[in-house]
Amino acid sequence: MAAPGTKRVLIVDDDTSIVNVLRDALGLFRHDHTYTVETAADGAEGLASLERHPFDLVLLDLYMPRMTGLELLAEMRRRGLKTPVLMLTGNEDNKSAESALANGLFAYVPKPFDLQQLEILVSLAASSHSPVAA
């Protein structure tokens, strides 16, 4: 079981530099809880991680090989997973944003993202979900 105040976060992104920035940022965010981070390089790996463990939050890229962020989000909701999702993307496509929001996206975060804004969104999203056991 996770220590009190620990939130499990899954980062799903094929760009290792973004994954590293997000992992480092989660370690620096000042909140009442800490973050345990797992990563996946694409939506298919992310789905496999979600099948193995519950998470408090998913940080998700839009465009990835094998399974896009939109496809992963839709599959999560189809399976009844209510985990909050923040979608980080450099895409300005309103249709993608609308589709993601229709599938229960917590927030659409444009790249490059502001770390202070991301900190607020991460805290709100992670706090909106019931705690999970590690």
PLM regions and their residue ranges:
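Two-component/phosphorelay signaling modules centered on CheY-like receiver
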Residues: 16-38
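Acidic catalytic/metal-coordinating carboxylates
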Residues: 42-45, 68-71
